[in-house]
Amino acid sequence: MPFVELETNLPASRIPAGLENRLCAATATILDKPEDRVSVTIRPGMTLLMNKSTEPCAHLLVSSIGVVGTAEQNRTHSASFFKFLTEELSLDQDRIVIRFFPLEAWQIGKKGTVMTFL
């Protein structure tokens, strides 16, 4: 059950229409998870400073069970997410940062319980 959160200082007017759907599909492909299990949040218009600059930038937070826990996995994921984000948001790679958070099944609540018991 991947969670993807895109935070950017780009105004909402610069976020391409349908980005949430394309990011969901890309995440499912990149992490090899079913698309109907991916949760996407996009937060435009945030106040962000990166490398001492407020020029357009983005932070991507990727959390999931079992697929973001090693450097080898995340190197591959990173390359794919960077390709997607640079194309979709027209940002240079040095204006994007990705953070990966491995989750355990007991850390995600669903249907009145946690994923461990589903």
From Swiss-Prot:
The modification N-acetylproline is found at P2. It comes from Mus musculus. One of its GO terms (biological process) is melanin biosynthetic process. Disulfide bonds: none annotated. SUPFAM superfamilies: Tautomerase/MIF (SSF55331). It catalyses: D-dopachrome + H(+) = 5,6-dihydroxyindole + CO2. Pfam families: MIF (PF01187). It is found in: Cytoplasm. Its EC number is 4.1.1.84. This is D-dopachrome decarboxylase.
